[in-house]
Each structure stands twice: as structure tokens, then as C-alpha cells.
Amino acid sequence: MDVVILAAGLGTRMKSSKPKVLHRILEKPIIDYVIDCAKSLNPFNSFVVINPSLKEVAEHLEKYNIKIVFQDEPKGTAHALLSALPYLSSDKILILNGDTPLLRKETLDSFIELFNKNGLDMALLSFYPQREHSYGRILRDGEQKIKKIVEITDFKDELMLSSEANSGIYILKREVAELVKEIKQNPNKGEFYLTDIVEIAVNKGFNIEAYPLAEENELIGINTRAELSLAMRYLRDRIVKGWMEKGITFYDPALVWISPSVTIGQDTIIYPNVFLEGDTKIGQNCLICQGVRIKNSIIEDNVQINDCTVIENSHIKSASKIGPFAHLRPDSIIGKGCRIGNFVEVKNSTIGDGTKAAHLSYIGDSEIGNNVNIGAGTITCNYDGQKKHKTIIEDNVFIGSDTQLVAPVKICKGAYIGAGSTITKEVPEDSLAISRTPQKNILGWAKKKRKQ
């Protein structure tokens, strides 16, 4: 079986400089969903038909082992298939649309099985719409045999005769596909409609059937920003439902966004307004609170992420507590049982087990050991105006509040840093470092000031 994905439309209704099929749904381009679904069927060949002006699409498709066919002129879906026909080598052809990203492999498996089982020459995937749409309708005769497909723009009166809509997804034999050469130009739009192949094939005695195997939401085609938003919500609902069936609790399923590549462990609880993106992996029995965004990160078991925390390309080990209002920037590793508290920013740093930075700190380009206490207001001064430098803090160090550690610098294990210090040199093991100006009390000064 060959698969042909029709993606030559210019997508003018999207009002965008970006090609329609490259717009993203939960971080993934629309056409990637279709290609991945097609590839899961293990076809003999896969083709994508695009307009030559869509150079961005052609460049995007280079990462796939897929053949590109150019439709030199935008003359409609029939002309798009005609452009691909010389390159097809299989007796069966599955036709998909590049703007229908929610189609599932299970649906196509059933569709292909029915086509083969019933010895058909062509099959259509149909559905019964519940909302207003622009899909053509499938007309049947008194014996419920298919007669033709009528487009909503051309035959509005006839549409009252049928509520069965055409999804634009077909499987057909090569000899039926050849009939695309007989399709006439539509007088209203000047295009060649692939839907007209049905009436031609019926009149020639080919065996054709339509199967309503999918819900309307699965077959949504994206032509506008409103439909893009709708598809995002449908996919979100599908993903969240799947995770609930696997033992995840969502306080409000309609207010979370989870990318398809994310994984979540059992008994994790997720609050509203949470975004889990990229290749994020959440362990078991975690708590993800309101307003959290996690991207391309590993969160191990029993971790608590408190409100309004952002985590990017980082690794948090088990039983740690992060936030609220914390920011873990890329390449940060947080050890087991750590506490990274409110308004703490960590960047490109490794923090050992049991270490606490509870308030108002910046930790950048640092290597921090186990059981370290980092006082409120501590800053690793890692940038000298030209390049970044490393701070090393060994095990069991106590850093007092409002400390500046001017990198490169090392604090050896067991050392104490007095509050308000600026540390520029190595601090030896088990010693106290303090660099603040000695306190001076001027007796009676305030009383004199008030009398002035």
C-alpha cells in the first residue's frame, strides 16, 4: 500500500506567513501528526504532495524518509493526486489530508481491514457532524448504495438528503485512482475535485462503500486559527483522558496542557493551569501545583513542584520540593530531598542531596555538595562581563544570608560563611569566613538628628 498525503493548500485563511501544516498543536507541527500516523501503518511508500512555493514545508520534510511531490499549479485535490500518480507503485492507495492531525492509527487499521475484508474497489471514511462545517456530503440511493459526494458550496439543496459527511480520507485501488484523469474542472471554483471520482467510479460499476468509523473531533481539518485552537483542545482532552485512565488525578482536566511525548507516573496529582511540554517525564506520586510549566525535564518520584514554578531541561531527583516561584533553567540537576524555595533561580548547576536554598537566591554555573544550607539572598557572581566562572561548594557548608560568592571560588566542606559576606577567595575546610565591615555604633546620633 502507498500513502499519499495531500498538503498543497496554501492555507490563506490562517492569515499567516507560515505554511498552514507547519503550525503547531502542543508543540508538534500539524503535518507531523499525519506523517507519524501514516508511518505507523508500514506502507510500501509514503508521499506528500505540496505546492512548490512551500519551501519551508519541503525543508521540514527532509527529516522524514518520505517522498515529496510538487503540485505545480493549485488546481484542487484531484490534480494533487494526479501529480503523485506517476510515482505510485502499489495496487492500493491510502489518501490522507495534511491538515487532519487527530486521526488515529486504530481508526485507519479498522478502515483498511473493512476495505480488504469486503473486497472493495474504494472506501471512504465518513462521519456524522454535530456542528456546522464545510465538508461534502455522501449521497446514497434507495438501497443505501453510494451515488456520489456533493460539495457544500455547490449543491446546498441536495445536502438536506444526507447527514453523512465525507472526511476526505480514502483507500482505493490503482485502477480507480486512474479515473482521476476523467474528472472535469468545477465551473464555480475552476478546480478539479477529488470527490468527483466517486460518481465516475460508481457509474463504471466499481464497488464503493463509506464507513463512519470516527467521531467528528478526530477528523477535524484545520483551515483557520479557530479550528487550530479547537484541535488543540480535542487533543488535550484525549491526552488527559488517557492519563486519568492510567491513574493520574487532574483537579480540572480542561485547564492543563500536556504534550503527546510527556510521560506521567501513577498517583501523581496535577493542579489547573499546568503546562507539561517536550520530553518531560514525571515520576510516581508527584504533586504539580498551579501555574507550573515544565519542559524537557525529568521529575523523579515523590517530588512536589509548588505554584508558579518554571523548569526547563533539568533533572529533579526524588522527594525534593521546588518553589513556589522558582526557576530552574537548562542543565540544572537537583539532588534527592532538596528544597529549592520561592524566588530561587538555578542555572547550569548541580545541587547535591539534602541541600536547601529556601529563599531569594541565584545559583549559576555551580557545583554544590550534599546537605548545604544556602541562606536567603545568596548570589553566585558567575559573570565577569566577558565569560562565566564556576562556584564550588562542598558538603555540609553553611552559607549565611546575603552572601556574594565571586566566581571562580571554592568553599571547602564543613565551612561557614557569615551573613553579608563577599567571598572572593577559597574558604578552607571547617573554617569561618566573614568579610563584612565591622559594625560601628554612634551613641545619641538618632536623638540629635530628630532635634534638627
From Swiss-Prot:
Protein name per UniProt: Bifunctional protein GlmU
EC number: 2.7.7.23, 2.3.1.157
Organism whose genome encodes this protein: Thermodesulfovibrio yellowstonii (strain ATCC 51303 / DSM 11347 / YP87)
Keyword Membrane: no
Family (UniProt): In the N-terminal section; belongs to the N-acetylglucosamine-1-phosphate uridyltransferase family. In the C-terminal section; belongs to the transferase hexapeptide repeat family.
Assigned keywords, A-Z: Acyltransferase, Cell shape, Cell wall biogenesis/degradation, Cytoplasm, Magnesium, Metal-binding, Multifunctional enzyme, Nucleotidyltransferase, Peptidoglycan synthesis, Repeat, Transferase
Task of the protein: Catalyzes the last two sequential reactions in the de novo biosynthetic pathway for UDP-N-acetylglucosamine (UDP-GlcNAc). The C-terminal domain catalyzes the transfer of acetyl group from acetyl coenzyme A to glucosamine-1-phosphate (GlcN-1-P) to produce N-acetylglucosamine-1-phosphate (GlcNAc-1-P), which is converted into UDP-GlcNAc by the transfer of uridine 5-monophosphate (from uridine 5-triphosphate), a reaction catalyzed by the N-terminal domain.
Domain of life per record: Bacteria
PANTHER family found in the cross-reference section: BIFUNCTIONAL PROTEIN GLMU, NUCLEOTIDYL TRANSFERASE
Cofactor(s) it depends on: Mg(2+)
UniProt xrefs under CDD domains: GT2_GlmU_N_bac, LbH_GlmU_C
Sequence segments annotated as region (N-acetyltransferase): 247-452
